[in-house]
Amino acid sequence: MSRLFDAGAPVHFDNWTASFVDGAGGKSVLASMWPLLSPLSGSIVVTLDEVARAIRLVAERAHVIAEGAAGCAVAAATTGRAGKGKVVAVVSGGNIDLARFLSLVGTGP
């Protein structure tokens, strides 16, 4: 998303690679989606490691299986990049392969 806002228009990402955050990324954004996205004020960039830690945190503390895209919001909040003060992270969806989820959260404390 940050690259879209920098470009000011939909762009194609040649170097995109798939990850467990499949609901929040892809090779491009549909042109029909740009009018819905363009009014947003910006985006927050988080790493895959930060998202994985956020998914584990949600599983441990809230007992919720969160997919990668939902983990992005929690990662932004827990890293402090979402701003100061109280932050609400909406965690929706559990569309993640169970084996992948287990590999992210681990099996031990």
Show where each model-derived region lies.
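PLP-dependent amino-acid enzyme catalytic core
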Residues: M1-P109
